[in-house]
Design a protein with these regions (language model features):
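A conserved mid-protein helix/loop that constitutes part of the nucleotide-sugar donor-binding site
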Residues: 13-24, 186, 190-212, 219, ...
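Short hydrophobic beta-strand element within catalytic cores of glycosyltransferases
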Residues: 35-37, 285-288, 298
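A conserved, positively charged/aromatic
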Residues: 102-139
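Carbohydrate-associated surface elements
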Residues: 140, 161
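A short helix/loop element that forms part of the nucleotide-sugar donor recognition site in Leloir-type
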Residues: 167-181, 236, 350
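Aromatic "clamp/platform" in nucleotide-sugar-dependent glycosyltransferases that forms part
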Residues: 249, 268
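Conserved acidic donor-binding segment of nucleotide-sugar-dependent glycosyltransferases
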Residues: 300-301, 305-312, 321-327
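A short, well-ordered alpha-helix in the C-terminal region of glycosyltransferases
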Residues: 314, 321, 328-343, 352-355
């Protein structure tokens, strides 16, 4: 099975990590896989030297030049599957396939990792009509696609997976020393892009409530994005400069997870949340909202605590409960690690994805 994978992002987030895990997993399973991505992007920088790579990214969603270059590559390479991992990639692949004169075209698979509705404009409707199969990161995402009119037979759920070997090999970050934190101060962590739907504003508001009861608690937010100035202002307004740290983009997120005492996902919308998987694989107890597919990962009361989105008080109460109960933290952390090992490995995700490929390639 030869699959060609398209990701047009220049930055590195959970989606790009899943692309790389999928591509490398296909190769490890003995299948050919090629990556089409931004020539100057973070994904290319992190890809193995020996990986088949085509530097190509559309400047706009209707970049006919990029689509033409892709169509020529498809004609030459003749992949069985084209797996587009973002909306611009879907558009470029759909345009490229429409230019093909081959009697049998490659099957188009679209990854869907966000719990947003499909856009209703003409271009969006056209490009998604060309998709042979949607691979959804959660059942919550699949339900949204079905509500948008996608036939049930065209959408399948494949939960994301993580490389457990990388998790085991990551050293623990020395955050107390790096940020000059008080000895023994518990650390509550959040790893996500600083964008509105990740809900870090609620995380900071909850921190203000937590420190009233656990004054030595510290909060580390790893990520960058448009929300940074807003969060900086909020932290100052709430007098939390000594308690909340904006750590910026970090390539060592697994090491960070191992240094956290509690991991919090404050999203107001979320496809699945691979940061949850990373944290659970590192044995961290979770506080997460019920947004999107997160309840498919976090078992409330067993591997973590689920709270309603946008509820600062509920978020704070859950954090306080865990910070005050070490035995509960250890029990939930161990249960989360066991769950990820059993159900959310990269090998399982790759095998399920390959099964989707094989099912549509035979048609």
């Amino acid at each position: 099975m030869f699959s060609l994978h398209i990701d047009t992002a220049r930055t590195w987030r959970g989606g790009q990590n899943q692309v790389l895990v999928t591509v490398m997993g296909m190769r490890s399973a003995g299948h050919r896989a090629m990556l089409v991505a931004h020539g100057d992007g973070e994904l290319r920088r992190r890809a193995d030297e020996g990986l088949d790579f085509l530097p190509l990214a559309p400047r706009t969603e209707m970049d006919l030049s990029a689509a033409w270059r892709l169509s020529r590559a498809i004609k030459q390479l003749r992949p069985d599957i084209i797996h587009a991992h973002d909306p611009h990639g879907v558009a470029m692949a759909a345009l490229a396939l429409s230019m093909s004169t081959q009697p049998k075209r490659a099957k188009l698979v679209a990854a869907r990792r966000v719990d947003f509705r499909l856009k209703g404009n003409a271009l969006s409707r056209w490009k998604y009509d060309q998709v042979d199969r949607f691979i959804c990161a959660s059942d919550a995402i699949r339900k949204i696609l079905l509500a948008d009119g996608v036939a049930p037979s065209r959408a399948v759920t494949v939960h994301e997976g993580i490389d457990l070997g990388h998790v085991a090999a990551a050293p623990r970050a020395a955050l107390h020393e790096e940020f000059w934190l008080p000895h023994g101060a518990p650390i509550v962590g959040n790893v996500a892009a600083l964008v509105p739907h990740k809900g870090q504003r609620h995380f900071v508001e909850a921190a203000a409530l937590v420190v009233r009861e656990v004054p030595d608690a510290r909060f580390v937010i790893a990520g960058e994005g448009e929300l940074r100035p807003t969060l900086e202002h909020l932290i100052k307004h709430l007098n939390l400069e000594k308690h909340v740290i904006l750590a910026g983009f970090r390539p060592d997120v697994l090491s960070l997870h191992k240094a956290f005492d509690v991991f919090v996902m404050s999203s107001v919308t979320e496809g699945l949340g691979t940061s949850l998987l990373d944290a659970m694989a590192c044995g961290r107890p979770i506080v997460a909202t019920t947004a999107g597919g997160m309840p498919e990962v976090v078992q409330d009361g067993r591997t973590g605590i689920l709270v309603p989105p946008r509820s600062d008080r509920a978020l704070a109460d859950a954090i306080i409960k865990l910070l005050k109960d070490e035995a509960l933290r250890e029990r939930m952390g161990a249960a989360g690690m066991s769950l990820v090992n059993a159900k959310f490995s990269a090998e399982r995700m790759v095998a399920d994805t390959l099964s989707v490929y094989e099912g549509i390639a035979r048609r």
